[in-house]
Amino acid sequence: MGKGNNMIPNQHYHKWWQRHVKTWFNQPARKVRRHANRVKKAKAVFPRPASGALRPVVRCPTIRYHTKLRAGRGFTLEELKGAGIGANFAKTIGIAVDRRRKNKSLESRQRNIQRLKEYRSKLILFPINEKKIRAGESSLEECKLATQLKGPVLPIKNEQPAVVEFREVTKDEKKFKAFATLRKARTDARLVGIRAKRAKEAAESEDAAKGDPKKAKK
């Protein structure tokens, strides 16, 4: 049967149709090969995390999925600046950077800044020169305790929906006209300059009338 609202398949096989049958006999071997490649990569990047670089927390696009959180491509320059990490330095310590992404809300920026700070606090940074340990690098005792992280780096947990409290609608809320209020607010914003100009002209005309009593009589 077809999937979704698609056409029901009704193929009429002919013209040596056995040639066009797609087989899937290599699935078990692919699984073994992927596992071997993961092990090979983990050994190559040791003691770095086997799953790769740290990714930001972003929301899925479209109104259908925007309540879900997932891993993004890389951190923005604003997020790195808020955490006090340079973009070039971030790449060397396992943090993904995306120069194209822009922060569109304060909440997402603060969430990722906090994520970077948490990662930085847990990170064991091996010194370039063991004899001269620079600021920010871990000591030799801490480096001996380092182990490779096998799972995802700082796994993302979806937020729990807020608890909604039900109550009766008040009389004032029933009388409130949302559309009229929004329309009045838009009108006031559009006419603020014109009304200020009219008020200024009216004040100037009153001052002129007070200064010349003959003009006021006329």
Swiss-Prot record:
Q: Which UniProt keywords apply?
A: Cytoplasm, Ribonucleoprotein, Ribosomal protein
Biological process GO annotation list?
A: cytoplasmic translation
User: Does the record bear Ribosomal protein in its keywords?
Assistant: yes
Q: Which domain of life is it from?
A: Eukaryota
User: Region labeled Disordered — which residues?
Assistant: 196-218
List, alphabetically, the GO terms of the cellular component aspect: cytosolic large ribosomal subunit; cytosolic ribosome
Q: Does the keyword Nucleotide-binding apply?
A: no
Renumbered to this chain, the Basic and acidic residues biased-composition regions fall at 199-218
Q: Where in the cell is it found?
A: Cytoplasm
* Record-level Gene Ontology MF annotations: RNA binding; structural constituent of ribosome
Tell me where it mainly resides: cytoplasm
Question: So what family is this one in?
Answer: Belongs to the eukaryotic ribosomal protein eL13 family.
Q: What does this protein do?
A: Component of the ribosome, a large ribonucleoprotein complex responsible for the synthesis of proteins in the cell. The small ribosomal subunit (SSU) binds messenger RNAs (mRNAs) and translates the encoded message by selecting cognate aminoacyl-transfer RNA (tRNA) molecules. The large subunit (LSU) contains the ribosomal catalytic site termed the peptidyl transferase center (PTC), which catalyzes the formation of peptide bonds, thereby polymerizing the amino acids delivered by tRNAs into a polypeptide chain.
Can you say what this protein is called? Large ribosomal subunit protein eL13
From which lineage does this chain's organism come? Eukaryota, Metazoa, Ecdysozoa, Arthropoda, Hexapoda
